[in-house]
């Protein structure tokens, strides 16, 4: 039974991270930027799982850390969406360009 080489996992993780980075740097909608940041975190999780599975001494450390990272990412997404809802109520927009002042 053939296994998938490590280079395939790493290539996929690099592609996911680059797509997320491109979206986070170029998009103006804050919700899309938040989704792109989550995509970058998932690329890092893919690296953790790939290195823990395909390393010299395979163990579950990377997979457990990846689950912990997913829980932190879910909390980050919930907090980010709550902040976005509060900003939308105050300014009626979620565009990044229009949120450049600290005072309302």
Curated annotation (Swiss-Prot):
Its EC number is 7.1.1.-. It catalyses: a quinone + NADH + 5 H(+)(in) = a quinol + NAD(+) + 4 H(+)(out). Signal peptide: none annotated. The keyword Cell membrane applies. The chain crosses the membrane at residues 4-24, 31-51, 67-87. Coiled coil: none annotated. GO terms for cellular component: NADH dehydrogenase complex; plasma membrane. It is a multi-pass membrane protein. Keywords: Cell membrane, Membrane, NAD, Quinone, Translocase, Transmembrane, Transmembrane helix, Transport. One of its GO terms (molecular function) is quinone binding. It is found in: Cell membrane. One of its GO terms (biological process) is ATP synthesis coupled electron transport. InterPro entries: NADH_UbQ_OxRdtase_chain4L/K, NUOK/Mnh_C1-like. NDH-1 shuttles electrons from NADH, via FMN and iron-sulfur (Fe-S) centers, to quinones in the respiratory chain. The immediate electron acceptor for the enzyme in this species is believed to be a menaquinone. Couples the redox reaction to proton translocation (for every two electrons transferred, four hydrogen ions are translocated across the cytoplasmic membrane), and thus conserves the redox energy in a proton gradient. NDH-1 is composed of 14 different subunits. Subunits NuoA, H, J, K, L, M, N constitute the membrane sector of the complex. Belongs to the complex I subunit 4L family. NCBIfam families: PRK05715.1-2, PRK05715.1-3, PRK05715.1-4, PRK05715.1-5. This is NADH-quinone oxidoreductase subunit K. It comes from Bacillus cereus (strain ATCC 14579 / DSM 31 / CCUG 7414 / JCM 2152 / NBRC 15305 / NCIMB 9373 / NCTC 2599 / NRRL B-3711).
């Amino acid at each position: 039974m053939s296994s998938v080489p490590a280079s395939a996992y790493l290539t996929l993780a690099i592609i996911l991270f680059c797509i997320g980075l491109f979206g986070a740097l170029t998009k103006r909608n804050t919700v899309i930027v938040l989704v792109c940041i989550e995509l970058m975190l998932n690329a890092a999780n893919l690296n953790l799982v790939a290195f823990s599975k395909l390393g010299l001494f395979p163990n579950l450390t990377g997979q457990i850390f990846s689950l912990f990272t997913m829980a932190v990412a879910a909390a980050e997404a919930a907090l980010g969406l709550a902040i976005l809802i509060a900003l939308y109520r105050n300014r009626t927009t979620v565009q990044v360009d229009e949120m450049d002042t600290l005072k309302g």
